[in-house]
Regions:
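Acetyl-CoA-dependent GNAT
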Residues: 3-75, 86-88, 92, 96, ...
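Positions that flank functional sites
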Residues: 32, 108, 131
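Structured catalytic core of nucleotide-sugar glycosyltransferases
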Residues: 58, 92, 112, 124-126
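Conserved hydrophobic beta-strand within the GNAT/NAT acetyltransferase core sheet
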Residues: 67, 101-105
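Conserved acetyl-CoA-binding loop-helix of GNAT-fold acetyltransferases
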Residues: 78-92, 110, 114-118
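Conserved catalytic-core motifs of GNAT/GCN5-like acyltransferases
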Residues: 104, 117, 122-138
Length: 154
């Protein structure tokens, strides 16, 4: 996993973002802007050929964080890459004294919801029409407890 990203890494993240999220994808400029804040957590995962196959961007504000973007290359989903990436991210956020982590997930993305629930994220709200008029997002939250390692249940 890479936490020190070079320009070409950011370009690869933007390309993967575009392939995963189409019209809802963040621009290269938006991704770069999140890298400017040293408190934020941005991690990329590469395969054996230095291709970026996953990434996560979390914004830190005081003792809270929000996972803004999280993507795994389609053909690599279901292989534990997202689980590992989320675990490392939560550990890094904990080291930054973050107490609560929030994220939004599409109501129809059951696989992602199960992943988050395995890390003890709880549904705390809903944003109606967030992804489209008929597609809400669930707001989920996890409390990071001091002195414990982050574990996700399989």
């Amino acid at each position: 996993m890479k936490t020190f990203l070079k320009k070409e890494d950011i370009l690869k993240i933007a390309e993967l973002e575009a392939s995963l999220f189409k019209e809802r994808a963040w621009t290269l400029e938006l991704i770069e802007s999140e890298l400017e804040n040293p408190q934020n957590v941005v991690i990329a995962v590469e395969d054996d050929f230095s291709e970026i196959i996953g990434y996560i961007i979390a914004k830190v504000i005081l003792d809270e964080a929000e996972v803004l973007r999280f993507g795994i290359k389609k053909e690599r989903q279901g292989q534990g890459i997202g689980r590992g990436l989320l675990r490392v991210t939560l550990d890094m956020l904990k080291r930054k004294s973050v107490k609560k982590v929030f994220l939004e997930v599409s109501a129809d993305n059951i696989k992602a919801q199960r992943l988050y629930e395995s890390f003890d994220f709880k549904k705390v709200g809903e944003r109606r029409g967030y992804y489209s008029p008929d597609k809400p997002a669930f707001i989920m939250c996890k409390t990071l407890e001091e002195g414990s390692h982050v574990k996700g249940r399989d």
